[in-house]
Amino acid sequence: MRLLLAALLALSGPISQALAQDFSLTIKDHKFDPAELQVPAGKEFTLKVVNSDVTAEEFESDDVEKLIAGGQSATITLGPLDAGRYEFHGEYHEDTAKGALVAK
């Protein structure tokens, strides 16, 4: 029994690290929240974008364009990214829907 418990505890480290690679953003009132999100450099990760507005919005950057209907969400796999700042915006509300991923 102790051996099983030790094995489960040893495995929980990699599991929690995998879970730490999932991030989320919310679109509300045509703004991204949080507006800046820190992500790991050099690793692939998933970004869930939840659109809480009733109207559609796009999550758009130099390399990604994803339309998200009002009240819906989308999961995007990104990376690996070099260390740096990667800006994104919402195409339909560019004046307010702005943000950045900061890879460290």
Name each region found by the language model.
Residues P14-A20:
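Sec/Tat signal peptide C-region and signal peptidase I cleavage site
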Residues V49-N51:
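Asparagine-centered strand-capping/turn motif at beta-strand->loop junctions
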Residues R2-P14:
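Bacterial N-terminal signal peptides
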